[in-house]
From Swiss-Prot:
It comes from Synechocystis sp. (strain ATCC 27184 / PCC 6803 / Kazusa). The keyword tRNA-binding does not apply. ATP binds at N57, Y501, R597, H625. This is Polyphosphate kinase. The active site is at H468.
């Protein structure tokens, strides 16, 4: 344990002043995402993408985090967070902090980006500004394609307020009966089955031939709003206003009471679709008070839950514009490269009626026996490394068993198809499919059923725990011996997100790791109560204890006259035990650099507490997702990668695995990655003691150092030196 420094003042690390609020820290993260959309150094259509991500992130935040806080308020929960706030206080501060960001998002889109789009020949017009010819075209389009799928729902004593589905766009329509002069209210849902933006053909919009033109269109809801007469014949349309509702979408299952977890999750998904309580109302800023009050009452919301939007609602639909053929307005495309160690690995290709055949080359197992392989995605190809490892295992005649954890995968997953092929080839295949992966529950249920149909042993996880670890175990017969090959990573087995997220993975056949992973899978699929592992750090078994011990060890080195150094990269830092250990280490003189993309509850730079701790966040083209933990250890350096963040949920309520990387060249590679990230002055933000983030700016464009650009350039340089490394 760390001993108190004689000169260190006594500090109560439980003092709320030493912690940032989790929810407000997350909002600060999303503000950094928004900034990418505001930054004129970002390509134009990529700026729209970041506005869409900002909106999509907020949707999930309200569906889960705000919904949870509201449930706590309703249950009269008054327990304080580490930063000293009640649930009610957090809701008020979320609302106060978020409103300027939402306003900023809409202002920059309506008054900056739309003009820039027009300069590039992309016109998102308002219906009121259209020519007569354009209106005639849209009226016919409405009759042919929109009107047949609309359903007006009256609201009166005989027609109760209709159910408003989660995240749907709706028109609140006020009509007047000319016979009785009575005003009536109706709701019209904007069909989610139709494109959000209706394109106008070139011959209709007639663009200026002397200016660039690529696309012209109008929001779908405006086309509906200006053609409502056909929905309410005989009525006078008084007004209509767009609104959007967000509902609680979290899933709660009493696992110990569920006879069949899959069926229980399915039932909760049905409840999510049918609808839980509303948590947010987004509404046009011009909506009159009587309509606003009516919606609030019918949805059970208060003023704090209502967000006035001056412009387009539901900006996550801006993802559409990334599909336009305008490469000059997007990030420069590039392809992942084949890791140098794997360039001569054979691939399986479609064969004759006997199935797949292999090309000439070296099998991946031979290469793994020659030394561990570290892969860095997306700079190095997931398909040519991890996916290839699993595919070869599926077809290799010497492989006996494949075991794997699946947390999230793609809709047309080649990983799942390889596991099915392995089962069909007579191998024993066991897969833990985590049914509780938020917003991927339905996808995972479908994969679980498909795997079971082909004879794969499928388990759904452990009661009370989410299995978040990213692990594969392959058991292979090699002569008289059995050898175990493993992959342990930081990211999901998803070829699509592997192109967008930065992640790391270790492929090895080190016996102690094979033994550890065997014990871990026995823990996941059977009744094993493994309490310790030779090499792996496993949550909830020993990870927090070991992490705290390694932090304390660095402090001990300092207290004994040596050097202490910690560098850790993760998505979020929330766990108070870890934070207190870091504070104590900082007091002892340990130099600590933290690369935390999202939530950070640790307050850096506080005198006599955390003046030796620096925190940066890297936000860029790719989502930083890898977790790396470096400890100097008196010169006997240790470095780990894995699936866990330093969050209480990861360390106590999830199954996680973190692995030491011990091969010297790979340790050096990981240290180089950390060094490049820490030197980033293009996409890095520094966390200040007051909770604000300040973006680093190079003194000149020539001095710009973007870590993601450097990693990309390094990968491309490898292909320049060796064209065989270009990924297919």
């Amino acid at each position: 344990m760390i001993q108190a420094m004689p000169s260190a003042p006594t500090v109560d690390f439980k003092d709320p002043a030493y912690y940032f609020n989790r929810e407000l820290s997350w909002l600060a993260f999303n503000q950094r995402v928004l900034h990418e959309g505001l930054d004129d150094r970002t390509p134009l259509l990529e700026r729209l993408k970041f506005l869409a991500i900002f909106c999509s992130n907020l949707d999930e935040f309200f569906m889960v985090r705000v919904a949870g806080l509201k449930q706590q308020v309703e249950a009269n929960v008054t327990k304080l967070t580490a930063d000293g706030r009640t649930p009610s206080q957090q809701l008020k501060e979320i609302s106060k902090s978020l409103r300027p960001l939402v306003y900023q998002q809409n202002q920059v889109f309506e008054y900056v980006l739309k003009e820039k789009l027009a300069d590039e020949g992309i016109f998102l017009n308002d219906y009121v500004d259209l020519s007569q010819e354009e209106r005639q075209y849209l009226h016919q389009f409405y009759d042919d394609h929109i009107f047949p799928v609309l359903t007006p729902l009256a609201v009166d004593p005989s027609h109760p307020f209709p159910y408003i589905s989660n995240l749907s766009l709706n028109l609140g329509v006020v009509v007047r009966d000319p016979d009785t002069d009575e005003e009536l209210f109706a709701r019209v849902k904007v069909p989610p089955t139709l494109p959000r933006f209706v394109a106008l053909p070139e011959d209709v919009c007639q663009p200026d031939p002397n200016k660039p033109w690529l696309w012209t269109g109008v929001p779908l809801e405006q086309v509906i709003a200006h053609n409502l007469a056909s929905l309410f014949p005989g009525m006078i349309i008084q007004e209509c206003h767009l609104f959007r509702v967000t509902r609680n979408a979290d899933i709660a299952v009493e696992e110990d009471e569920a006879d069949d977890l899959l069926l229980a999750i399915e039932e909760e998904l049905r409840k999510r679709r049918v609808g839980k309580s509303a948590v947010r109302l987004e509404i046009n800023a011009s909506t009159p008070k009587n309509i606003r009050d009516r919606l609030m009452t019918d949805l059970g919301l208060e003023e704090i839950d209502v967000y006035d939007i001056d412009g387009l609602l539901g900006l996550k639909d801006l993802f559409f514009f990334l599909s336009l053929p305008a490469p000059h307005l997007k990030d420069e495309p590039w392809a992942s490269v084949i890791p140098p160690r794997l360039k001569h690995v054979y691939e399986f290709v479609d064969g004759d009626e006997d199935g797949r055949v292999q090309q000439e080359g070296i099998d991946i197992f031979t290469l793994i026996r020659q030394g561990d392989i570290l892969v860095h995605h997306p700079y190095q190809s997931f398909t040519a490394s991890v996916q290839q490892f699993i595919t070869q295992a599926a077809y290799d005649p010497h492989v006996l068993t494949i075991k794997m954890t699946l947390y999230r995968t793609s809709g047309d997953s080649p990983i799942v198809n390889a596991l099915i092929a392995a089962a069909e080839n007579g191998k024993q295949v066991a897969v833990l499919v985590e049914l509780k992966a938020r917003f991927d529950e339905e996808n995972n249920i479908n994969w679980a059923r498909k795997l079971e149909q082909y004879g794969v042993h499928v388990v759904y996880g452990l009661v009370g725990l989410k299995t978040h670890t990213k692990t594969v175990l392959v058991v292979r017969q090699e002569g008289p011996d059995i050898r175990r090959y493993v992959h342990i990573g930081t990211g999901n087995y998803n070829p699509k997100t592997a192109k967008l997220y930065t992640d790391l993975g270790l492929i090895t056949c080190r016996p102690e790791l094979g033994n550890d992973l065997t014990n871990l899978f026995n823990f996941l699929t059977g009744y094993s109560r493994q309490k310790d592992y030779q090499k792996l750090l496993v949550a909830p078994v020993n990870m927090r204890e070991r992490m705290v011990a390694m932090i304390e060890r660095e402090a001990d080195h300092c207290l004994n006259g040596g050097t202490g150094r910690i560098v850790a990269k993760m998505n979020s830092l929330v766990d108070t035990q870890i934070i207190r250990a870091l504070y104590a280490a900082s007091q002892a003189g340990v130099q600590i650099d933290l690369i935390v993309r999202g939530i950070c509850c640790l307050r850096p730079g506080v005198e006599n507490v955390s003046e030796n701790i620096r925190v940066i966040s890297v936000i860029g083209r790719l989502l930083e997702h890898s977790r790396i933990f470096y400890f100097h250890n008196g010169g006997e350096e240790e470095i780990y990668i894995g699936s866990a963040d330093w969050m209480s949920r990861n360390l106590t309520r999830r199954v996680e695995a973190v692995v030491p990387v011990e091969q010297p060249d790979l340790k050096q590679e990981l240290q180089s990655i950390l060094g490049i990230l820490l030197a980033d002055n293009r996409q890095a933000w520094e966390l200040q003691p007051d909770g604000t983030y300040v973006q680093r700016r190079p003194a000149s464009p020539e001095q710009s150092q973007s870590s993601q650009a450097i990693f990309t350039a390094q990968a491309i340089a490898e292909t320049t030196e060796d064209p065989e490394l270009r990924s297919v």
